[in-house]
Amino acid sequence: MEKKALVYTGKAKKLYQTENAAVLFVEYLDQATALNGQKKDKVLGKGALNNQITSLIFEHLQQQKIPNHFIKKVSEHEQLIQVVEMIPLEVVVRNYAAGSFSKRLAIEEGTKLVTPIIEFYYKEDRLDDPFINEDHIQFLKVATPAEIVEIKALALQINQALSQLFQRLNICLIDFKIEIGRTKANQLLLADEISPDTCRLWDLNTNEHLDKDVYRRELGEIVPVYEEVLQRLLTAN
């Protein structure tokens, strides 16, 4: 399948048309960003790592009967995905307090939450992706009440599958964010990516950060950290 016209450029990916209108080519970029794009650097090797990590995780989730847009990895930096209408929400699932959650509620990082907490953020760069609730979502006509219920159920299903997977890798899934797409048949699918860019991952024994916080907080180089996550995934498969 050939790469055709560029249709979208994001912070860390480019999307291209293919000869099949229902399929897109995704190119993962050697780009690291944080703070809604305010911090940005070229990082050689990062694109290939995120492409491979996301491919492995999406394949695993498909085996767990969790619907997603992934078709296949086609090169070091590229994969094919199903075309969906993206719902402009970031859905965050938190198992432990960390990041903005800890700051907002003055809860120490690493505090285990009694049950997973789901948060919604409106994907709008001009507004810095604000935290919103279900009433806002309905007012903005971003999703229907029935879709909100389905999105929350899907998010918890993904959380369970990912938590079990990372537990086997000696990694604690602190929190993660996902995006959801809508097919022409109005089926909701997991879309975008799941990688150390979108998850907080701590080593179970040392609490070492194995995610983008290493870049965000300037704790070190992210490529060796992402390579460690990939190697653990490959060992598990």
From Swiss-Prot:
Q: Does the keyword ATP-binding apply?
A: yes
- Please give the catalytic activity noted in the UniProt record: 5-amino-1-(5-phospho-D-ribosyl)imidazole-4-carboxylate + L-aspartate + ATP = (2S)-2-[5-amino-1-(5-phospho-beta-D-ribosyl)imidazole-4-carboxamido]succinate + ADP + phosphate + 2 H(+)
GO biological process terms, alphabetically, are:
'de novo' IMP biosynthetic process; cobalamin biosynthetic process
Q: What is the lineage of its organism?
A: Bacteria, Bacillati, Bacillota, Bacilli, Lactobacillales
The record's annotation in InterPro entries points to:
SAICAR_synt/ADE2_N, SAICAR_synt_PurC, SAICAR_synth, SAICAR_synthetase, SAICAR_synthetase_CS
What is the protein name stated in its UniProt record?
A: Phosphoribosylaminoimidazole-succinocarboxamide synthase
Report the GO molecular function annotations.
Answer: ATP binding; phosphoribosylaminoimidazolesuccinocarboxamide synthase activity
Q: Which UniProt keywords apply?
A: ATP-binding, Ligase, Nucleotide-binding, Purine biosynthesis
Matching entries from CDD domains are given as: SAICAR_synt_PurC
The family line of this record is: Belongs to the SAICAR synthetase family.
Its annotated pathway reads:
Purine metabolism; IMP biosynthesis via de novo pathway; 5-amino-1-(5-phospho-D-ribosyl)imidazole-4-carboxamide from 5-amino-1-(5-phospho-D-ribosyl)imidazole-4-carboxylate: step 1/2
- Its EC number(s): 6.3.2.6
Q: Which Pfam families match?
A: SAICAR_synt
What is the species listed in this Swiss-Prot or TrEMBL entry?
A: Enterococcus faecalis (strain ATCC 700802 / V583)
